[in-house]
Amino acid sequence: MRGVVGVLALQGDFREHKEALKRLGIEAKEVRKKEHLEGLKALIVPGGESTTIGKLAREYGIEDEVRKRVEEGSLALFGTCAGAIWLAKEIVGYPEQPRLGVLEAWVERNAFGRQVESFEEDLEVEGLGSFHGVFIRAPVFRRLGEGVEVLARLGDLPVLVRQGKVLASSFHPELTEDPRLHRYFLELAGV
């Protein structure tokens, strides 16, 4: 399925990711069940509510299949905001929250405050230059394991990281008109 990218469509802003992919000429396939992952080389996990995403992914059999495929190296992942939380090894203060655990990162939910404290900030992204970040109840990566590369920071805080074919951002690139981060992920995934 070259040219097709899955977007986890259980909850959150999956439509915005589909639009971002469409602008790049890439077909987006909504993933709501384990069977929808068949043939995909790449999956985007959108922002939304991380607890809900985790519970539904587990309930619909998606969690185990995604974990297996990532560990085999046959699936690239891009998690934004709540999606990044779901990818993390640990969620600070929420040890029981469902998570995929494929990114060696310890993530703090809502680290920049509540919805009313959302903000936008220009970031320097390694290899891309200046990129406009939209932070909405954004998480932050408090600790990173071996092999996790920081691609962008807000002050001293990592807000965009990569480990192999797993990419995770605290911010929402899908809420901008800038396609570069989605294009970077497509290249990472070989799509």
UniProtKB/Swiss-Prot annotation:
Keywords: Glutamine amidotransferase, Hydrolase, Lyase, Pyridoxal phosphate. GO terms for molecular function: glutaminase activity; pyridoxal 5'-phosphate synthase (glutamine hydrolysing) activity. GO terms for biological process: glutamine catabolic process; pyridoxal phosphate biosynthetic process; pyridoxine metabolic process. L-glutamine binds at residues 48-50, 109, 136-137. The active site is at residues 81, 172, 174. It catalyses: aldehydo-D-ribose 5-phosphate + D-glyceraldehyde 3-phosphate + L-glutamine = pyridoxal 5'-phosphate + L-glutamate + phosphate + 3 H2O + H(+); L-glutamine + H2O = L-glutamate + NH4(+). Pfam families: SNO. It comes from the Bacteria. Catalyzes the hydrolysis of glutamine to glutamate and ammonia as part of the biosynthesis of pyridoxal 5'-phosphate. The resulting ammonia molecule is channeled to the active site of PdxS. This is Pyridoxal 5'-phosphate synthase subunit PdxT. The lineage of its organism: Bacteria, Thermotogati, Deinococcota, Deinococci, Thermales.
